[in-house]
Amino acid sequence: MSDKSDLKAELERKKQRLAQIREEKKRKEEERKKKEADMQQKKEPVPDDSDLDRKRRETEALLQSIGISPEPPLVQPLHFLTWDTCYFHYLVPTPMSPSSKSVSTPSEAGSQDDLGPLTRTLQWDTDPSVLQLQSDSELGRRLNKLGVSKVTQVDFLPREVVSYSKETQTPLATHQSEEDEEDEEMVEPKVGHDSELENQDKKQETKEAPPRELTEEEKQQILHSEEFLIFFDRTIRVIERALAEDSDIFFDYSGRELEEKDGDVQAGANLSFNRQFYDEHWSKHRVVTCMDWSLQYPELMVASYSNNEDAPHEPDGVALVWNMKFKKTTPEYVFHCQSSVMSVCFARFHPNLVVGGTYSGQIVLWDNRSHRRTPVQRTPLSAAAHTHPVYCVNVVGTQNAHNLITVSTDGKMCSWSLDMLSTPQESMELVYNKSKPVAVTGMAFPTGDVNNFVVGSEEGTVYTACRHGSKAGIGEVFEGHQGPVTGINCHMAVGPIDFSHLFVTSSFDWTVKLWTTKHNKPLYSFEDNADYVYDVMWSPVHPALFACVDGMGRLDLWNLNSDTEVPTASVAIEGAYALNRVRWAQGGKEVAVGDSEGRIWIYDVGELAVPHNDEWTRFARTLVEIRANRADSEEEGAVELAA
């Protein structure tokens, strides 16, 4: 510790000494500059000489301009001429003949002995004011009359010549004391630091001028410009992702390929809660009416909501796009319209479009490439389109030939082109027995079929229907439910055995029923629920697995290969709010449910959703057993009826 303290004290003393040296050096420099300024002020220019030089230069320039080379000057400067007490700087001769070339003084005679016969001597006349020049080279002696000029002594500092080359440069000689030399040696290590400080000062001086302050009018113009709104809408989503997690927040949903997830989300056969989607502003006091997952971006899900009675000034219909990939708590996109959205789906083959069916009967189309939250297209409220609530919207077909199919509760089915929603391409009245319109509450197309479909009605009856052909309209009738059909879904898993003829329905009669289009009676009735069953859906990857939700907030998963009496897995949400909708994710590993409070619950299914190689054959045997049991029960019923 003592060594460190001594070292610090020594450093402090050196710093103080350096500061004193700098101050002393600065003071001496200021005194030297002051003396030089005083000497410059005492100096006076020679008006005669300067005027003469100026005239000589003008004459030489004039002669050179007309092509005549000027002769050497007839007057040569003399350094000093001492004769008793006389001092001469210049000898100004009277006009002489052009043969005279130069003059010299006795003081310079010694240095000019080697100049040959052209040297001249200076002699005094009887008149002290006249000087005679005599040339040894001339044959005759000729006298030149000279005049005496006023002499003023001036000392000029020599001009400093700086040449930029690799040779060593030496400044003008300056007298320095030994103390100054020691000071410079002590300060020398700090030269680099001082140069850095000087560079920093220069950089600060050369900084750009501060930007001009915008006026309020210019600020408002920028805030309301379309470019700013598009930039702000895009940037705020990126910032929300960055605040939520450290994933690839710059992923763009406008056309880049999806990065597939690796590995299973959850191992095990039980349902585990993953996350919840809820927005305090847009979800509060609204009921989840429909949900759909995107085919192009499997992590995106859209949900539609009914009106909020506590906020009459808010839009009645809302559709929110949620993102499973990022942990942010706000929706990816917010869409709304002036009527409650009863059904919603992503437009297949158009990853940027979202289709919604409203309570007023309008079909609305949103585009996430537009910065507007309102629909970019909508159908008219006219007799040619829907005038009743639309609970069914679906895009069917192929990439090059597809249509939007919508059905309203008055039994009217319309086919639309997504490029033009002003008028439907075709429409059909779903009427039973040519007089009774079908109040459709649900619609489903079998996998790979765009012509035949099944619908559920408010009366509890299920119908098959056809879009084209001689049997267009309502076909078969399936009776079995004792209440309105709330959900209907066709078998979706594709495998070695085709089960596309199967479909399931849910109803207010607390049951879920399994059907086949080959028979108008239910194959099986699942009666484990104690409240309204609001929705049902097959797993997209497992042939024997489906999910259903009821009014008690319970989510049930049924694996028919394991058991047909009780659910394989079941979970009740917190608060026991009624669950209105259920939707499987495209990979079949997650299932989403929406409740009556506007919340969406995401559950991981785990290995329960992963099918084994023998699942299709096992499910075929299960169906055979179900048919056999149904046949036995029908025979027993017939015997009892006969008895």
Curated annotation (Swiss-Prot):
Residues 1-13, 20-60, 187-219 have a biased composition (Basic and acidic residues). The keyword Transport applies. One of its GO terms (molecular function) is microtubule binding. GO terms for cellular component: axon cytoplasm; cytoplasm; cytoplasmic dynein complex; cytoplasmic ribonucleoprotein granule; host cell; kinetochore; microtubule; nucleus. Residues 145-161 are annotated as: Interaction with DYNLT1. It is found in: Cytoplasm; Chromosome, Centromere, Kinetochore; Cytoplasm, Cytoskeleton, Spindle pole. The modification Phosphothreonine is found at residues 105, 174. Belongs to the dynein intermediate chain family. This is Cytoplasmic dynein 1 intermediate chain 1. It comes from Rattus norvegicus. The lineage of its organism: Eukaryota, Metazoa, Chordata, Craniata, Vertebrata.
